Amino acid sequence: MEGPRLPDCVSDRIFTMNRRYWRVAAIAAATISMPAMAQDMDHNGMDHGQMDGMSMDHGQMNHDMTPAPSPGEETEHHEVNDSSPFATGSGTARVPGAEGSMHGLHIMSGDWMLMAHGYAWGVYTDQGGARGDDKAYVQSMLMATAERPLGDGARLTLKSMFSLEPLMSARGYPNLFATGETANGIGLIDRQHPHDLFMELAARIDVDIAPGATAFLYGGPVGEPALGPSAFMMRRSSRYNAEAPITHHWFDSTHITYGVVTAGVSASRFQIEASAFRGREPDEERWGIETPKLDSWSVRGTWTPSPNWAAQVSYGRIKSPEALHDDEDEGRLTASIGYGDDRLSVTGAFSAKNRLPGPVLTAWLLEANWNPTGGHNLFGRVENVENDELFPEGEPLHGQAFRVTKMQAGYAYRIPLGKLFGLALGGSGALYDKPRALDAAYGKSPFGWTAFAKLSLGD
């Protein structure tokens, strides 16, 4: 089944606009590369209406900033603005507007507001059981964005995101029951793959169409389509969890996509959007930009009834996402609800991954981060997933689906380092529930633990 075909005149115009976005995104990457390595972006509180000459509201979207500084002045932001029903997650996704603040670098330069966030995360993990392994590694991310008015109720946002995780082994790091993508032509099992150098190079234009409502167009050579909740690196509910979810390829594996165009309508309490994008996941060559194409599609509706809540439902038809299953497409249905305030962030999500042809594999996720006082943080994640990729070809259990549950809990203590930086020290442990048929491969009761030090520009 293919997505609906656009008339040739409309299609030509979209492709022309998409090429322009790629040029703009490339210029943005060179212009706004500054010290920032971003994960926990949530941008609640920046009232674009406070910026000189700007009537930017992105549908009353706030970015959690102090009032704009004087040109050339650097600042941090730390106020929570509960008046905005939503904040920005990854791509065009929304998260609760009152999830709490984060710090970051902000500079005014003429009409431009430049923003930077990021982290370098030193991690050691020891995944137990017969198929476990241990590894010391560094995760990293850098994000820089730039915004300015274009006049006549239009605004431009340039977005870039980078990672040095390609320096990691192609096999990534140990993560029991995680699957997806390849290393040296072999499917990754019980491993989490590294991210690409280029995680986002995109631009977004918002145009006022009614009081409190905008139409927007987002796209670029690297971006994220309108599918699933905000990616796990951008959810405050997982801000100190150093392990990727084992359900990553059910919910947010499209967060690095080579070729994306998204159009939508955004208002204070809802957003409706549709995307065309490349379905194939990134290959093993993590340093370059793969050839963009638009062979897949998705739609997403998001509801933000108050600053504390954000809910989304989305569906995508993905063309041949996995290199080792070249003849399989995927129909992915996701639904999620997020809650946030200045102390607590929670995400609950469901996904049904329909292999075409093949079975429907479902997954559930519940994760939270609680900041009871000061720098103390308690976090946890529970995942339940039906996975048929736990055994490679040639093994008797290859292709058989097993439902497994991962239960993880951890603690982190954040130490402020001046106004802009912070250091979080912590760790987590994980237990698993699985069918007895997996005892021979994984052991009866595998246990994993992780320790980390996370240096952040912003938080």
Give residue ranges: language-model regions.
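Transmembrane beta-strands of outer-membrane beta-barrel pores
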Residues: 120-128, 162-168, 221-225, 267-269, ...
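Outer-membrane beta-barrel translocator/channel fold
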Residues: 166-197, 315-324, 345-365, 375-406
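Residue-level signature of outer-membrane beta-barrel architecture
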Residues: 109, 146-149, 207, 264-267, ...
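Surface-exposed coil loops of outer-membrane beta-barrel proteins
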Residues: 169-302
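Repeated loop/turn-to-beta-strand initiation elements of outer-membrane beta-barrel proteins
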Residues: 114, 152-156, 211-215, 269-273, ...
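Outer-membrane beta-barrel "beta-signal"
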Residues: 409, 443-459
